[in-house]
C-alpha cells in the first residue's frame, strides 16, 4: 500500500455526517478549521450557542462611555481549554490578528477587539467562541476515512447566520444532502 496523500483542510468547514455522530458536542456540529497539518489539526465549532455575555463585564472593560451592557452570544468551540476565548470574524477588522485567512475571515484573541466591538468599531461580523477542537496527528484523517465528517468550502453566510440551530441543516442543503435519506451505511470506494 502506498503513502497516503495529505490534504490540508485549513480554512475549510467540517460538517458532522448525519447518523455517524449521534450524541455529544460533535452531533450536528460545524467546525471551521483553523489549522490542519501533518502534526494535527485545530478548529472551532461555530454552531453551539451556549449563552449570552456582557462584553464589558466579561472582559472587565473599564470605560465610562459604555453605560449599558453589550450583550453578545457565546459559542462553545470544542472540548479543549474552555478558559480561552476567540473571536472568529470578518477580515474587515485587522488589528492584532491571531490568524488571518485567504477567505475573508480572521481570528483574534485579545482585549482590544472586545473593546472595539463594545464601541461599535469592531468587525462587521464576529462570533465569540470559547474552547476549541483539536486532533492528534492522523486522528482527523481517520475520522474522515470513517465518514464522520463532510468537508465543504468556507461559507461566511453559514458561519455568521443569525440562527445557530439551522446552520447544520443549511450546510447539508448546500451540499445537496437530505438528512432523512442519508444512509448511515457509508463507505469509501
Curated annotation (Swiss-Prot):
- Leader sequence segment: none
| One annotated Gene Ontology cellular component of this protein | cytosol
- Pfam families xrefs: DUF179
Task: Please give the coiled-coil regions recorded for this protein.
Answer: none
Q: Which domain of life is it from?
A: Bacteria
> Whose protein is this, by species?
Rickettsia felis (strain ATCC VR-1525 / URRWXCal2) (Rickettsia azadi)
- For this entry, the protein name equals UPF0301 protein RF_0044
Q: Which family does it belong to?
A: Belongs to the UPF0301 (AlgH) family.
Amino acid at each position: 500500500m502506498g503513502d497516503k496523500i495529505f490534504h490540508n483542510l485549513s480554512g475549510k468547514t467540517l460538517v458532522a455526517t448525519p447518523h455517524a455522530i449521534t450524541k455529544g458536542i460533535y452531533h450536528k456540529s460545524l467546525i471551521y478549521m483553523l489549522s490542519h497539518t501533518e502534526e494535527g489539526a485545530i478548529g472551532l465549532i461555530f454552531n453551539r450557542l451556549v449563552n449570552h455575555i456582557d462584553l464589558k463585564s466579561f472582559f472587565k472593560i473599564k470605560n465610562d462611555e459604555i453605560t449599558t451592557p453589550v450583550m453578545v452570544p457565546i459559542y462553545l468551540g470544542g472540548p479543549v481549554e474552555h478558559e480561552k476565548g476567540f473571536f472568529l470574524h470578518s477580515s474587515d477588522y485587522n488589528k492584532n490578528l491571531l490568524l488571518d485567512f485567504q477567505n475573508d475571515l480572521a481570528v483574534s484573541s485579545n482585549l482590544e477587539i472586545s473593546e472595539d466591538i463594545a464601541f461599535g468599531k469592531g468587525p462587521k461580523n464576529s462570533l465569540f467562541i470559547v474552547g476549541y477542537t483539536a486532533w492528534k496527528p492522523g486522528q482527523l484523517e481517520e475520522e474522515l476515512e470513517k465518514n464522520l465528517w463532510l468537508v465543504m468550502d468556507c461559507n461566511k453566510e453559514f458561519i455568521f447566520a443569525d440562527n445557530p440551530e439551522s446552520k447544520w441543516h443549511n450546510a447539508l442543503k448546500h451540499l445537496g444532502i437530505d438528512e432523512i435519506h442519508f444512509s448511515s451505511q457509508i463507505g469509501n470506494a
